[in-house]
Structure formats: structure tokens, C-alpha cells
Regions:
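Carbohydrate-interacting regions of secretory-pathway proteins
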Residues: 19-241
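Hydrophobic h-region of N-terminal signal peptides that target proteins for export
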Residues: 8-18
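Positively charged n-region of N-terminal signal peptides that target proteins for export
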Residues: 1-4
């Protein structure tokens, strides 16, 4: 009897599926936009280029006041003591590509060696650090979500070599009363290696104390940190999502 019922149900399922058409599960609601991928390290056709070399700082300003004061040529280099820089344009959800390198001459150790940071929305730091044969606390090494999430692996290249971060960021959402509706999430690929896999960001990345979730606008500038080390950047572009 049980075998008969099973066969009956199976035959019914077959007839149900057999009577359907493949077109019923085809989705024609949104045609994907055609985008031309960049060749090599060039940005894709729909990217906003934030720094492409040739001393172009038009899209940046100081995070203190006035114009950005970093050295700008084919690459963009931190000038210690001048403060960080931030984009004039604001971003929320985004795909970010950025290349960086620590100085080839090794000075210092731990957090004092090739230190900078990529601050998403100016609040959530993906750590930049020379972590090649350089021990420090693990949630503060290169590719960490600073003081929150240890990278899956250490994919750092030797000092002086160009490195890449490809970052997918989903901004947090706040309710009208200022409470957090949904956290920020981030995925980070370092030199082609996945090191943060859709990680929840618990709030602002603080040097001292726990993360905070103070409400803020849906879009804010991207910021690069002056931590006193001459770290260089190039080929910075973003795709708002």
C-alpha cells in the first residue's frame, strides 16, 4: 500500500512538472546593463575613478579642512601629519577597488609599520598594514575589519610591492528613531584571496572601546587614513551598488 501511494504521488509530480513550460521560470524583468571590464588593472566602464594618477586630487579633500595635502603623482602618498583625506562625493553600498603599498624600506614593527586604513563611509576601517612577517594583534593586521574581524588568511606581499583590495560593502540602515535596522556587511578580497566573507560590521571601528552604532546618513565620504607612515595608493575606483 505504501509503495502504491508513493508511486501515485510520484506520477502526479511527474505529470505536474511535465505539464509546465520552461518559459514559466524565465525571468525577463531586468536586462543586465552591458559593462566593459577593464583590461588588467583598468577600471570597468561604469566605475567612478577616484584616483587614476597624474596628480589628480580633484575628487579629494582633507578630512580636517581645505584641500588634500598628500603627495600626488602617478601614485598618492600619505604625508605624515597632514591628516587623512576623504572623497568629495559620498557613497553607501559599493564595490571598491584600491591598490596600496607599504614603504620598501622597513621601519618599525607591529602597528608602526606601513599603517594606514580604508574607512568606508569614514567610519568602518579595513586595515592597511605591512603584515608581511610582522606580528601584531590579529584583528589589527592587514585586511582586518579593525578591532572586529580577523582576516581568514594573511595574504600580504613583501613591503614595497603593490597590493590590491577589492571590497564589496553594504551600508547599515537606520530607522527613523535612530535605532539600527540592519548592520553593515563587507567582503574583502586581498591580492585575489578572499579574506573577509560577507562579515557583519558591528559598528564603528574604534581604537579604544566597543563599536558604536550612532545613526548617520545613507551615504558618506570614503576616507584614507594618515597614520604617520608614507603608504602609497593608486588605481582607486568605485561602483555604487
Amino acid at each position: 500500500m505504501k509503495k502504491f501511494i508513493a508511486l501515485f504521488l510520484l506520477s502526479g509530480l511527474f505529470l505536474q512538472v511535465h505539464g509546465q513550460k520552461p518559459e514559466e521560470t524565465e525571468d525577463w524583468s531586468r536586462r543586465p546593463e552591458v559593462v566593459t571590464p577593464g583590461k588588467g588593472t583598468l577600471p570597468p566602464s561604469d566605475a567612478i575613478v577616484l584616483y587614476g594618477g597624474a596628480g589628480d586630487l580633484d575628487k579629494w579633500e582633507s578630512d580636517r579642512d581645505g584641500p588634500a595635502r598628500w603627495d600626488a603623482g602617478e601614485e598618492l602618498t600619505v604625508v605624515a601629519g597632514t591628516g587623512g583625506i576623504k572623497t568629495k562625493e559620498s557613497f553607501g553600498d559599493m564595490q571598491l577597488h584600491i591598490e596600496w603599498r607599504s614603504p620598501s624600506e622597513v621601519k618599525g614593527d607591529g602597528q608602526g609599520r606601513g599603517n594606514s586604513g580604508v574607512f568606508l563611509m569614514g567610519k568602518y576601517e579595513v586595515q592597511v598594514l605591512d603584515s608581511y612577517q610582522n606580528e601584531t594583534y590579529y584583528n589589527g593586521q592587514a585586511g582586518s575589519i579593525y578591532k572586529q574581524s580577523i582576516p581568514l588568511v594573511n595574504a600580504c606581499l613583501p613591503p614595497g610591492e603593490w597590493q590590491t583590495y577589492d571590497i564589496i560593502f553594504k551600508a547599515p540602515v537606520f530607522n527613523e528613531d535612530g535605532s539600527l535596522e540592519s548592520s553593515a556587511y563587507v567582503t574583502v578580497i586581498h591580492n585575489g584571496v578572499l579574506i573577509q566573507n560577507h562579515v557583519e560590521i558591528l559598528g564603528t571601528t574604534e581604537y579604544i572601546g566597543p563599536p558604536r552604532n550612532d545613526p548617520h546618513p545613507a551615504k558618506l565620504p570614503l576616507q584614507l587614513q594618515d597614520h604617520g607612515n608614507p603608504v602609497s595608493f593608486r588605481n582607486i575606483w568605485v561602483r555604487p551598488l
